[in-house]
Amino acid sequence: MSAVAIATLVIAAASMAAQSKPNFAGKWTFVPDSTGAIAPIGRGVGLGQEFTAVHDDKTLTVAMKDPQLGELKSVYNLDGSETRNPINFGGQTVDRASKVKWDGAKLVITTTISMGANVAEATQSWALDGSGNLLVETVSSFAAQSMTTKATYKKN
């Protein structure tokens, strides 16, 4: 195989890999399922009823309003390096340290939430379905208990 053919294959493969990563930018609204479930908020990782995402080559920035905490903004580095997005809850600082990785077309955000000696972990997976809806699955664990929530968001 010639060097030109190999170079063409490498460029094509890189281009296809880049295309498989969706862009999550936009304003998103929770879509209730048939059970009437409410939008997941909790343990510092839920996205609530509505949120806005700004997504560029380097970061994903998520802004939402929490009924107890007010406006929350989290910035995630897409290169896998850790980001810290502390929040103030009841006069105490809750540290949130996150790392992001791509699993094909799925964005996976793993966050460690620390408040004093209490530590929890949450892994949130973001993916677009065939209709362009955002599917978010969150697995949270604290004190040997695990909880999984699934939510669908529609882009406004």
Identify what each model region corresponds to.
Residues A17-N156:
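Hydrophobic small-molecule pocket/channel-lining residues, especially in calycin-type beta-barrels
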